[in-house]
């Protein structure tokens, strides 16, 4: 979908705070509330906006450990393995990638024991050949909100 300047401005506002009311957006952009409603509805219907959500501080709710896990898998099993892993609530991202590993997973854990159980569970999935786990020491930037 091609975005015009108004669509982009609406998205920028919603990316900063998805709770911003249509009335506030309309006032900021000097357009009618109905225009904002229609534009946001169009953005939702076309799949540009997939959800209105919050950005959590995971450490504040007990997820103190972030890991990046490379997974080498048998070619025919990759999609199935990705689907299984994606169902785990601790997993934030599953990527099908090129390179030494076939799958990259980013996940949040409460502690090392929780991570250890997860990795051993991944290794028990049929078709997983090996994993390589990197523990994140410090999150410098973690923000998936790209400017439209």
Curated annotation (Swiss-Prot):
This is Uncharacterized HTH-type transcriptional regulator PH1692. Keywords: DNA-binding, Transcription, Transcription regulation. The keyword Lipid metabolism does not apply. The lineage of its organism: Archaea, Methanobacteriati, Methanobacteriota, Thermococci, Thermococcales. Signal peptide: none annotated. PROSITE patterns: HTH_ASNC_2. GO terms for cellular component: cytosol. One of its GO terms (molecular function) is sequence-specific DNA binding. It comes from the Archaea. GO terms for biological process: response to amino acid. Residues 22-41 bind DNA. InterPro entries: ArsR-like_HTH, AsnC-type_HTH_dom, Dimeric_a/b-barrel, Tscrpt_reg_AsnC-like, Tscrpt_reg_AsnC/Lrp_C, WH-like_DNA-bd_sf, WH_DNA-bd_sf. Residues 3-64 form the HTH asnC-type domain. SMART domains: HTH_ASNC. Coiled coil: none annotated.
């Amino acid at each position: 979908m091609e975005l015009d300047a108004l669509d982009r401005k609406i998205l920028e506002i919603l990316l900063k705070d998805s709770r911003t009311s249509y009335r506030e957006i309309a006032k900021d952009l000097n357009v009618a509330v109905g225009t904002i409603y229609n534009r946001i509805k169009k953005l939702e219907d076309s799949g540009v906006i997939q959800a209105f959500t919050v950005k959590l501080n995971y450490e504040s709710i007990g997820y103190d450990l972030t890991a990046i896990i490379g997974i080498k898998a048998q070619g025919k099993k990759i999609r199935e393995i990705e689907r299984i892993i994606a169902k785990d609530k601790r997993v934030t991202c599953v990527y099908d990638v090129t390179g030494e590993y076939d799958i990259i997973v980013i996940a949040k854990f409460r502690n090392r024991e929780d991570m250890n159980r997860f990795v051993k569970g991944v290794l028990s999935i049929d078709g997983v050949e090996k994993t390589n786990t990197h523990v994140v020491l410090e999150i410098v930037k973690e923000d998936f909100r790209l400017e439209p």
